[in-house]
Amino acid sequence: MFPRVVRLNSRLVSFALLGLQIANGAITYQHPDDLPSNVNYDFIVAGGGTAGLVVASRLSENSDWNILVIEAGPSNKDTPETRVPGLADSLPGSRTDWNYTTIPQDALGGRSLNYSRAKVLGGCSTHNGMVYTRGSEDDWNYWAEVTGDQALSWDSVLPIMKKAEKFSQDFSDQSVDGHIDPAVHGRDGLLSVVASYTNVSFNDLLLQTTKELSDEFPFKLDLNDGKPHELAWTQYTIDHNAERSSSATSYLETTGDNVHVLVNTHVTRIVSAGNGTNFRSVEFAVDSNSPKKVLQAKKELILSAGVIASPQVLMNSGIGGREELQAIGVDTLIDNPSVGKNLSDQAATLLMFDTTLPNTDYDVAAALTEWDKSRSGPMAHGARLNHLTWVRLPDDKLNGSDPSSGKDSPHIEFQFRQISHQLPPADVPNQVQLPDPDSIGVVLQFSVVNLYSISPGSVILNDNDPFANPMIDLNMFGDQKDIAILREGVRSARRMFSSPAFKDVINGTVYPPADVTSDEDLDAFLRTSAESYWHGVGTLSMSPQNASWGVVNPDFRVKGTSGLRVVDASVIPRAPAGHTQVPVYTFAEHASVLIAASYH
């Protein structure tokens, strides 16, 4: 992910948002000692992120069931800045972030990368860029094939996605004619989606490019129709009141009081009955200096701690590769070397072009005040620019091997960010020399993303301290094909901004410099500029029922156990052609049906 250009004064934010009213149907507890002693929970959800709150909400529809959610971070009610769409770029690295760092990456010259994961109720849906992309039809069919579960095919999940979605006219009543295909969307679900946009001249120039370079950059009416390999208007999880729509606001706040939420509390282990394979108990504590407590679910324990923390919890509980667990002094209860492996993410780089286009900068304090008073202005939008571009590379650029899920899937994404006088801050871990701000004018900045990295990473424990961060290895560019595809993405972007539409407003590329053109020079640039796009999945991958690999079965049960399921991004076998929040919502909706059906 990329530069945090918005720098905020926390006192300013708190003052501006004093009037923000937040409802919550569930009962929230701030400390383990506050939990009622007379409630026996049918289900315990370990992790109150995107998936965990979907599961809790759906299970709560049975009023006879009591559900407990345990979340390490604060409540979204205590972090009002997460409600404001325009503050999304300020959240990574903040109090709502785990602030992970990867181990040094060999192919990046030993650089370690920031790896943002949300630590707040609602998880990454409370913390992300709110982009709503479903992935490609090919992705879902691939997942169905690799897991042996046709319930994950595109035709099977599309009704689930529509049922969960509440697409609506946005807060400013902008016309969306020509921006979306209404037939693709649902309107009666819980998760709010809009196609809001800012009126900037850059919009018209991009659309003109889709006519001038239509072979490479055709226009797509709706990026969520299952075949996303064109330029399209972005859609966001924002509600009609210009507030972020997350699993905390859309799902949790609609539940009854049969859902209890314990925040600021870490899940340290899941506990088996008599060192067997029946896992229904969870151990938790506020911090490393606090006493640990254990609660047992009457029916099931659902682990939803995310792509990093879920494998960490399993390994600390004795579920993982025997040799790795023995090395850190953890007794092995279930020997499964797939735990923590298969980390699948997306590699990205930032591109900058010197331009005479009007800039998109604004006064943050004034914009916050406007949003607070009227839910309008730049803070009401998910981004300063309004389009995503998906590029499918021609076969002759793939060196005989196509890493995508199919012919209707793109290899590359362009996410346009801003046109600004501001450059990324100096504290971004980036070894490439940024241009001197005094030597250039306004700069168009956007990300170029390799959607399908084929070199898998891993999450491994340093020791058996559940409060210590694990070792995260993205293995970025571990395969030369990954850097080759991102290199072609950079060249594709340069072709876009060499089109006639941009001839009079683009003065040239400044990052990387214009003379960086050869394979060797572009690769050197990428090795010193690439970052993770923070779309990690796969560390507890789903696989067929009797497969010798993978961690969970298609019913989300952890292989070799009873009473324990995993529902979060970690079970998705591979990153999609797009952003990950919609697949996580969809997997969670599917899992909720399976869990509830087990008790009917």
Curated annotation (Swiss-Prot):
GO terms for molecular function: flavin adenine dinucleotide binding; pyranose dehydrogenase (acceptor) activity. The active site is at residues 535, 579. Its cofactor is FAD. Pfam families: GMC_oxred_C, GMC_oxred_N. Its EC number is 1.1.99.29. It catalyses: pyranose + acceptor = pyranos-2-ulose + reduced acceptor; pyranose + acceptor = pyranos-3-ulose + reduced acceptor; pyranose + acceptor = pyranos-2,3-diulose + reduced acceptor; a pyranoside + acceptor = a pyranosid-3-ulose + reduced acceptor. GO terms for cellular component: extracellular region. N-glycosylated. Binds 1 FAD covalently per subunit. It is found in: Secreted. Belongs to the GMC oxidoreductase family. This is Pyranose dehydrogenase. It comes from Agaricus xanthodermus (Poison yellow meadow mushroom). The lineage of its organism: Eukaryota, Fungi, Dikarya, Basidiomycota, Agaricomycotina.
